């Protein structure tokens, strides 16, 4: 199997933008947030167990998950959050496992916001890449992008591991605090490094 990089970072750190930059260089990306969206859209595999666990009030008329209502619930009710995670996390993990052997690029990237928090993912990856930025920037970016309140962003951050812990676990770090060009330079530098590692990995 190809060399696999686990890409992670806190909310608002720029994981998606970094992953898109690697994709533009020809690298295949498995995005667990995207998988979660697929699982919770109309007729997705997670809809039936979510309906059973939480009721019809969390399912929209089109059959997809009401993400806003669910977000409000899980960040005010830890038991509900654990119940949702017990449904989603195994499904996301199994889908990731199925996609990994299909990667055809010289190396692959798995984007996992909770890479360090959820058991199992670290054993799937060969290196951990952390996208990092100061916490005030995480908050302001997320509020601008997602229309969440500052408290809602902080609630998300509270269930993610700390910035210090992420950085301590990182094999590689991209500092995303200075605009697109700064990010792109770091991506291209790591891309060259990963290509060399991938060739050794395949020997």
From Swiss-Prot:
Listed pathway(s): Cofactor biosynthesis; coenzyme A biosynthesis; CoA from (R)-pantothenate: step 5/5
Domain DPCK positions: 4-201
Coiled-coil stretches: none
Chief localization: cytoplasm
Keywords: ATP-binding, Coenzyme A biosynthesis, Cytoplasm, Kinase, Nucleotide-binding, Transferase
Reactions it catalyzes: 3'-dephospho-CoA + ATP = ADP + CoA + H(+)
Pfam families recorded: CoaE
Binding-site residues, ATP: 12-17
Protein's GO biological process: coenzyme A biosynthetic process
CDD domains per record: DPCK
Gene3D superfamilies: P-loop containing nucleotide triphosphate hydrolases
EC assignment: 2.7.1.24
One Gene Ontology MF term: dephospho-CoA kinase activity
Cellular compartment(s): Cytoplasm
CC terms in the record's Gene Ontology section: cytoplasm
HAMAP family: Dephospho_CoA_kinase (MF_00376)
Family recorded in the similarity comment: Belongs to the CoaE family.
Protein purpose: Catalyzes the phosphorylation of the 3'-hydroxyl group of dephosphocoenzyme A to form coenzyme A.
Protein name, per record: Dephospho-CoA kinase
Organism: Nitrosomonas europaea (strain ATCC 19718 / CIP 103999 / KCTC 2705 / NBRC 14298)
Gene (UniProt): coaE
């Amino acid at each position: 199997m190809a060399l696999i990089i686990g890409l992670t970072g806190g909310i608002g750190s720029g994981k998606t933008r970094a992953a898109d930059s690697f994709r533009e260089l020809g690298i295949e990306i498995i995005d667990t947030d995207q998988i979660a969206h697929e699982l919770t859209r109309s007729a997705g595999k997670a809809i039936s167990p979510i309906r059973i666990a939480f009721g019809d009030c969390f399912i929209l008329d089109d059959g997809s998950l009401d993400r806003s209502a669910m977000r409000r619930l899980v960040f005010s009710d830890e038991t509900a959050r654990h119940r949702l995670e017990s449904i989603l996390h195994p499904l996301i993990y199994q889908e990731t496992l199925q996609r990994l052997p299909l990667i055809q690029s010289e190396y692959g990237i798995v984007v996992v916001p909770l890479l360090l928090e959820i058991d199992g993912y670290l054993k799937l990856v060969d290196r951990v890449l952390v996208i990092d930025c100061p916490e005030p920037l995480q908050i302001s970016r997320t509020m601008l992008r997602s229309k969440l309140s500052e408290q809602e962003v902080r609630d998300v951050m509270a269930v993610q591991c700390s910035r210090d812990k992420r950085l301590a676990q990182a094999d590689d770090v991209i500092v995303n605090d200075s605009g697109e060009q700064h990010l792109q330079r770091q991506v291209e530098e790591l891309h060259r490094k990963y290509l060399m590692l991938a060739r050794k990995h395949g020997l």
